[in-house]
Amino acid sequence: MREYNVKAAPISFLTILDIKKEEELNCHGKMTMTGYISDDEEEECLKILRGDVWEKIEAVGEKGDTEILFWGLVTDFSIERINDQKKMTLEITTGSCLLDREVHMRSFQNQNMTYKEIFRQICGEYEVDIIFESSLEDKTGQLVLQYAETDWEFFKRLSSRKNRYLVPESKMRGTRLFYGLPRGKKIDFSKNWDYKMQKDLAGFYRKKSNGILDISESDCLAFIFQVRENYRIGDYMEFQGIQFYIYKIISKYIKGEMIHEYYLMQEKGLAVPVDMLKNAAGCSLDAMVKEVKEDKVQVEILSDENKQQEINIFYPYATVYSTPDGTGWYCMPEPGDMVRLTIPGKQEGEAFVNSSVHAETESPDRKDPDFKVLKTKYQKEVRFTPNSIVITNNQGTRIELTDKEGIHLVSAHSVVLEAAEDVTISSDKGSLIAAGTSSVLLKQKGTSITLDKGISFTGGELRVQ
């Protein structure tokens, strides 16, 4: 439809001076509208603009029929007085901007969850309708982390994993997103239309070098034309037997009518490179151990907004030293311990859990830095002090190795020494003392000496010198 007039509501203009509209893949649609308002309307406009305003811009045909040009949220405005006239400018943005207001910290640690389910879960927190034009049923198979990103930024990054993109709805109230290219209508291309064709070589090389290997230069051939007709992203046309799809629109208000410039490309050329989690590289997130399995752990991230999720991903646990043959240090944390989930690079799938972090405690074990203590939750302990090593079960049994006094072994039960060959006990300068409250028995094969209220000897021969 060719417009005869343009009208706006609920904020209207006496005279429209200028309109600019831009729409593109992975971008919020925006329209800037400038015009005159009456003095009486200024106060009413300011009252309306105190809250969220959904502004609808329509083209009015010669016979009074209407067609929506743009419908979005007023995100900025200005009113100025010039030569006794009030000029107002509105910036209107598609409802997708509601997803781009706040940053979030969420983890998705269910490796059986699909990307589509992640989209659905987050959209459920808003009044957002999302239409999947491409399949997104793949399971994540790894950690998916939303780190200091808005939901809009997060959705774009997830979409890029399939070389896809988001397209916001620009002709309805509310928020609707398309994952992938919307199914548009065919454009009846007229041979009388002026057009331009150009090759986006910079875009081609950028995509090629970022993992999109099956793209060719001809896929990045752009077709551009200007008409008065109102089309939308996803509409397509055939030119020389090739289908070109609208991926970008720039509209201007020229001499009382809207002129639309459309950019089209083959669908294959619209693929976007995979976007990495750049701002999380090197970050460490405070977490609590949920479960331990062999040399891996499950964790709950303390700052996670997604608290009610099912967690079934185990992360490698960093240790002091380890080799594939099992050589090294094996000392795993316990459930409830505080640790750190570390993202070493730009892919959250590479995450691992780092060493435990000391929490506030009144335990005397952590008061003296000169004391090094290795202790389990079962109270089994090895303690290194400046002048001793103590091994104890904290239940009456211990071995002390001290610099001045030597070795002190205390047992709450029996002490058993066994050897396949000799056992030698000797003292270079002191005495050898064997003492027992009940008795003392020295035995060698069939010969024995028993000290029990008296001395008993058993054997074939006794020699006394």
Where are these regions (language model features)?
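Amphipathic alpha-helical and helix-coil boundary elements used as assembly
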Residues: 1-465
